Design a protein with these regions (language model features):
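Nucleotide and nucleotide-moiety/phosphate-recognizing core
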Residues: 1-138, 146-159, 166-170, 177
């Protein structure tokens, strides 16, 4: 549950007639494997479900729980609260695939804020970073990124706009109506 949203079920919130989670799943529709960390729920697309250990341990624990199911060379790591992420997916994939030295490509907002949960990883780099943070309860995602060479993918369009507050959710709903 999202603390800044009063404990609301963030992935289940509706933007543009779809849940936040379904909007993110639409963005990765072509993926061979789609893994979602969190409690099971109905989704518009079939996914593999995993739970972080312990439940509620945070994004790194969720990423670790799902990482073993991925067989592709590149792994997208996307938060469930990114309703406009679809157009960013090719940019993220292209950035990490086009730079042999890079382990991860992350969206960077116009303000300069890096969105570590809007990222494309070389799967080998992600697994190595997860090994470095293993056993660290509540490790921040930036700790994973710090263990790898990162490419910044500018996001002037706001594709990585996330919904952490009610005002941000209202903004996402307004964007979806345009």
């Amino acid at each position: 549950a999202a603390r800044r949203l009063g404990g609301a079920d963030k992935p289940g919130l509706i933007v543009g007639g779809r849940t936040l989670l379904d909007r993110v799943l639409d963005a990765v529709a072509g993926a061979a494997t789609i893994v979602v960390a969190g409690p099971r729920r109905d989704t518009a697309r079939p996914v593999s479900w995993v739970r972080e250990d312990p439940p509620g341990a945070g994004p790194v624990a969720g990423i670790a729980a799902g990482g073993g199911l991925v067989r592709a060379d590149v792994t997208l790591v996307l938060a469930a609260d990114l309703p406009g992420i679809g157009p960013a997916v090719p940019a993220l994939l292209g950035a990490v695939s086009g730079s042999p030295a890079a382990g991860v490509a992350c969206l960077v907002e116009a303000s300069g804020q890096v969105n570590y949960l809007a990222a494309a990883w070389r799967t080998t780099a992600l697994r190595a970073a997860l090994e470095l943070t293993a056993g660290t309860h509540g490790a921040p995602v930036r700790a994973l990124v710090a263990a790898s060479e990162m490419i910044e993918v500018p996001d002037p369009q706001g594709w990585g706009y996330d919904c952490d507050t009610w005002d941000e959710l209202a903004g996402a709903r307004e964007r979806a109506e345009r």
